[in-house]
Each structure stands twice: as structure tokens, then as C-alpha cells.
Amino acid sequence: MKELIDQGKITHWGISEATEEIIRRAHKVCPLTAVQNRYSMMYRNYESLFPVLKESQIGFVAFSPLANGFLTCRYDEYSTFEKSTDYRSIMPQFSSAGIVENQKLIEWLKIIAAEKNATPAQISLAWMLAKNPFLVPIPGTRNLKRLTENIQAESIHLSVEEVTEIDDMLEHIPMSQVFGGSIVKK
């Protein structure tokens, strides 16, 4: 990558699913621009990387910031997904047991959304945007209405106190495993 940058063929580079050790090693060889890892209210394991990212001025690109759509709060224990075509059919957060296990999170997220005149998805994204200036969520969607909804999350203000309150709540709310991750260690 350093050779490509030196040749002017690329201007920035990043890595995905990286640990602190890998970030430090890669950054020493050729300064990183960004690290892309799974991150959401339900999967916060990579928060331990934030100090090194801040120190090294590396951006954090959060993929699956809505836990594969679960944090939209649009699903219940009766939701079904076609096993042969819809990957959510194998994700623990979308199983009937997972939805029941995550009920307190869903209820709590809906309350905050109502207080802010927002959707649960917008609160999830606004929380991320308010946490750190180097954190950029990249939610995916195939729906223009959802894209507009996600973009509007940027206009929702969460104070430092509100972010801290959300973080504290997330530490104590029981949650299921999420696809591609594991239970957040308390």
C-alpha cells in the first residue's frame, strides 16, 4: 500500500475487522486512513480500539450499525425470513428467542426515539455520530425511504450526557448474540 501511495496510485487506505495489534503494525508501515469493523448498540466490542484510533487519527467505519436491521425495531417474534434467500433467517438477533431476549432493548430504544421525535434507527445512528468525530456508520438499505431516514439521523442532537446515559443503559440491558459477533462482555 505504501508503494501505491508513493506512486500516487492511491491516496488513502484502510483495513477491516482489525485488532489493535494489527492496526498498530499496519499503521507503522503505512499510515492508515480508516478501519472498518462491525459496530452497533448490540456489538460494541471494538470500543477498546477508540483510544488508539483517536491517538493515531484513524477513522472508524462502522458496518452493520443497525445490527443487520434489527435496531430498526420493525421485527417481532412472529417475523419470518425465507431460509433459502434471506440471511436474517440464521441471525441470532432475529430468532424468536433473540427477539424475546432483546425486548427490553427494543422497548427502551422506542422510548428514546419517541422522546426525540425520531425512529429507533435514527437514534442508533445519532448515538454513533455523537460518540466520536472519527466514527462513521455505514448503514445499508435498498429502500429510498430508509436511506432518507438514515440521513436524517445526522440532525438529531444527543448531548454528552445523553450518550453517556445510553452507554450506561447498554451496559445493563440483556441482549442476545448478534450475527458476526458475540455477546458484549459486561
PLM feature segments, named:
Residues S176:
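Substrate/cofactor-recognition hotspot
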Residues M1-I173, I183-K185:
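Beta/alpha (TIM)-barrel catalytic core signal, keyed to glycine-rich beta->alpha loops juxtaposed to Asp/Glu
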